[in-house]
Swiss-Prot record:
Protein name per its UniProtKB record: DNA replication helicase
Source organism (scientific name): Equine herpesvirus 1 (strain Ab4p)
GO molecular function: ATP binding; helicase activity; hydrolase activity
Chief place of localization: host cell
A Gene Ontology BP annotation from the UniProt entry: DNA replication
Swiss-Prot/TrEMBL keywords: ATP-binding, DNA replication, Helicase, Host nucleus, Hydrolase, Nucleotide-binding
Amino acid sequence: MESADILPGSRGTVDRRCEGSEEKITPPRPVEDFNPQLFPNEVYLNFTSMHGIQPVVARIRELSRKTVSAAMVPPLEWFERLPRLETPLDIEPLHLPFSVYLISGNAGSGKSTCIQTLNETMDCVITGATRVAAQNVYTKLSSAFATRHINTIFQEFGFRGNHVQAQLGKYQYSCSSSPPPIEELQKRDIVYYWEVLVDITRRLFESTASRGEFENIRALERLLGRAPGSLTRLAFCTNGSLPAFTRTNIVIIDEAGLLGRHLLTVVVYCWWMLNAAYKSPQYAEGKVPVIVCVGSPTQTDSLESRFEHKNLKCHVRSSENVLTHIITNRTIREYVSLSTNWAIFINNKRCQEYEFGELMKVLEYGLPITEEHMRLVDTFVVPEAYINNPANLPGWTRLYSSHKEVSAYMAKLHAHLKVSGERQFVVFTLPAYTFVKTAAFDEYKKITQQPSLSLDKWLAANASRVSNYSQSRDQDAGKTQCEYYSEHGVVVARTDVTYVLNSQVSVTTRMRKFVFGFSGTFETFDAVLKDDAFIKTQGETSVEYAYRFLSTLLFSGMINFYNFLKRPGLDEGRVREAYRRMAALTAKLIPGASVLESACDNPSGAPLNFRGLTDPPGFTGGTTNDWDDDNDVVFAALNEGAIDMLYCNYEFVRPETTQEVYSQFLMLKTMFVGRYSIFMDLFGGDFESSPFDTFVDNISYKGCEIFVGSMRGGVSSIALQTDSYTLMGYTSAPVYPFVEELARRKLHEGIAELFGAMNMPRMVLRDQHGFMSVLNVNLSEFVESVDDVELDMATAVDYGLSSKLAMTIARSQGLSLDKVAICFPRNNLRINSVYVAMSRTVSSRFLRMNLNPLRERHERDTVISEHILAALRDRDVQIVY
């Protein structure tokens, strides 16, 4: 490796990037002398991509040190006055200082790797624009190191569930000059987002909770005679509920192109307000927030929806996104010095085929489309009927432009499976429920002046709003049936939803699951044990629980080795040798099993005296009543080596202390690895690909339903939207952690009673590693906002699953898909949507589409493309290849 002191020079010098740095840059030294400024000792960097990323890290670190004078710091009193204003138009314009660093690039170019490096090199708040974006970042970060949960930017600045239905843009502010100064733009955004911001502000200052954590730390420093700021970090150790914005001034937002332009000011406003309210050290120092926006302005749209209650219609419109706003708005661009604070990542690393990569660049940057590009896309085109026929392209993911098209394809797929005689992919139906409170519904009709509004009509119009995810409209759902429970004041709407057994699915939100077994092969289970994958992904609450669970699976699954030896066609000599070696291994690890080893070495082949195993030392006689003759015959008929003496000599208990838990796991893991090595030596590949199933208790199947004796011994975990699952069926077995979680929910009394009596089944999933889990039901509460009145209208309960067999193009954003078939619309075709859909594939060999969008009439955002092309020619912009 080259000297750590040599920074990769890329359109700018090290001196310019680090100008104003508080740390001293030492002159070049020998290779073995480590430079702590460039490479801190506690950090492991990805050296293959560090060449271009290091200047990005240096520049963001430099921006984070920027401070403003005390006169420029927004005063606490300004925030406290806002909730008392009659209208947001009366807000006194105030400059809220901030910095921006923009990281853009085409799909799969390494933007997430850059976020990972920033996370490892500096203290920052990492967020996503959506839950999927946040969990994608979490997956990337946790693959290298243990990391805290990643929230959305909305969760970090205080957005709550009741804000979803807030009416944005109710007030409008027009700037008085052109181009407007920065404080005018900020007032415009605050006024636009007023309904949400005023509620967040009011809730903060009306809260009775103490906000004196940092004051207490400063008092402790004075008491101990310590230097000011020396104990500041203790505040986050002793007060876990402190807002993340008070910890650091670096805020990273992934997929920022999905956010409206006003969200930039909203984040800056909330950062200053929280730091002022908590009197944080960075507020006292006058530090300025650095908003690192990651994404692509040409890929994504910012969408805003507004529900019209009178006509029961939801209007969705595109709005200018944050990235486009930063790049194209003259005031913002000059204020943040965009040229020196912009990194563009080039080259698609997801699909590394040269011609296809060049095509993606053309679509991304608005370059001229040639006949050669069109001919390349022609090779992907097949008839639309071919894509929409479920019998074709099995296992491919269909992408559509609308939820209606997705739902229609799913219905067609299910109808095909019902008549195809397919045994692996079986169709089954389960009920989903919506509980509507009659009192709230009557109040809604009164406020909206719709006395004749029927519940069926309201449910049909609000189906996508009642659930907490838009993919609910993708499902193949039957007709809704309503039943009125007058004593409970609730109407229960039931809808039957169709699912496909053994199909690929994902969860629609962050949900609780209970892992109770493993279903895979000997090879996959051995891989899980060797790389500690389960400990890293499931042991988030307590490592002891994860080790205890694995010990249970190991103990229950050891019998699979003996079951393998009963397969017909195996060489008898190798089978006898396997029995002998396993007996020796068991005797070595469990001293009480030594009797087996001596029996296996008995050349006479005489039956093992099973009665003698239970006799005390020196016992020579006794009554025959102790042993049943039939049992004696059964045991004596078995070859002595065919019995796994692990189960005869080892009492499986649930240890309490950490040392005992790990000792038990280590012994059982050693036994599994030893047996695995024996069988690989004797049977090779035939063995490692054989089934290995193990559970905490006995299970049985009846059609698509799974029966489990007991869930005791399983472990609670979290299912993320970025995980890939196979739908294995459903179960009605009680899962006590789920029962306790439901009891903690503050549900309407009538709804809680009705739901508890339904015994709603739960889905059983297998993850990408092979672990089997029961998924809790997805329970979401719908609060309607009408004319400043909030109505707690309904509670929806479903299974929280979304099929990977078909989805909208918008939902596929950020995903890598193996095989993709796209149905583009023939009208309103947009190139950025085409780019998102085509760039999902990892290989163009597995890409099909119904038309060539380059030969069709389409819309293209040339304005933003021109700005990006200009940036590529700007020597101050950092280019990362």
